[in-house]
UniProtKB/Swiss-Prot annotation:
It catalyses: N(6)-(dimethylallyl)adenosine 5'-phosphate + H2O = N(6)-dimethylallyladenine + D-ribose 5-phosphate; 9-ribosyl-trans-zeatin 5'-phosphate + H2O = trans-zeatin + D-ribose 5-phosphate. InterPro entries: LOG (IPR005269), LOG_fam (IPR031100). It comes from Oryza sativa subsp. japonica (Rice). The lineage of its organism: Eukaryota, Viridiplantae, Streptophyta, Embryophyta, Tracheophyta. The gene is LOGL5. Its EC number is 3.2.2.n1. Residues 1-10 have a biased composition (Basic and acidic residues). Expressed in roots and leaves. This is Probable cytokinin riboside 5'-monophosphate phosphoribohydrolase LOGL5. It is an enzyme of class 3 (hydrolase). GO terms for molecular function: cytokinin riboside 5'-monophosphate phosphoribohydrolase activity. It holds the Pfam family Lysine_decarbox. GO terms for biological process: cytokinin biosynthetic process.
């Protein structure tokens, strides 16, 4: 009887049953193929910033989204790129030749795209991405963020722009933009270009649901223009059409 009982219990611990319990977690479907992440080359003083960078990278991998970033392995840039690369995701680092030395930014993981200038770097990152996310960062992060917001306002692209507002880091910026709306310098539709959330998961969900706001009737309708012929045109990624959008 004891032998029969042991045989009856054996299937529960069989390798086949154990393997069935260890099914791989399915990736969450996403409408984005690649997301561009702007963030600091410093880790920041709060551990929460670093945790958020890693969590964002993990969320991108879980959703099967490639990472596009400015290259390097330092600060938050390094954390998010390592999280994606280490999780089996694809990383595209866009690095300007001779502008940012390797000693300063460190090694770039994954696929390296070499460009000739900082202007080309921003244009290439934007062209390759389906959405933009800004983690906490400094002047460079703000410049990149505000530029893609402006491009959306000018109808160069209709891609969602997200702020990962970790511990309220971007509260002051959002308050400033709200004041600009109140004072008549930013239109209410243009304010809706920016999507913000405190966690990577919440932000990506919001970006997935993003619908571009209606544009002002007087806004210029511009087209994206990428020039690789000469440095003279490297910074010109758009050109105005003669007609106004009405």
């Amino acid at each position: 009887m004891m032998m029969e009982n042991s045989r009856e219990q054996q299937p529960e611990s069989s390798p086949a049953n154990n393997n069935s319990k260890k099914k791989k977690k399915k990736k969450t479907a996403s409408r984005f193929r690649r997301v561009c992440v702007f963030c600091g080359s410093s880790p920041g003083k709060k551990a929460s910033y670093q945790v958020a960078a890693v969590q964002l990278g993990q969320q991108l991998v879980e959703r099967g989204i490639d990472l596009v970033y400015g290259g390097g392995s330092v600060g938050l840039m390094g954390l998010v790129s390592r999280a994606v690369h280490g999780g089996g995701g694809h990383v595209v680092g866009v690095v300007p030749n001779g502008v940012l030395p390797r000693e300063l930014i460190g090694e770039t993981l994954g696929e390296v795209r070499a460009v000739g200038s900082m202007h080309q770097r921003k244009a290439e990152m934007a062209r390759e991405s389906d959405a933009f996310i800004a983690l906490p960062g400094g002047y460079g992060t703000l410049e990149e963020l505000l530029e893609v917001i402006t491009w959306a306002q000018l109808r160069i692209h209709h891609k969602p722009v997200g702020l990962l507002n970790v511990d309220g880091y971007y509260d002051s910026l959002l308050a400033f933009i709200d004041k600009a709306v109140h004072e008549g310098f930013v239109s209410p539709p243009a304010r809706r270009i920016i999507v913000a959330a405190p966690t990577a998961s919440d932000l990506l969900c919001k970006l997935e649901e993003y619908v571009p706001p209606p544009h002002d009737a007087t806004a210029l309708k511009l087209t994206w223009e990428m020039s690789t012929v000469s440095e003279q045109h490297a910074g010109s990624i758009y050109s105005p059409k003669p007609d106004m959008a009405r």
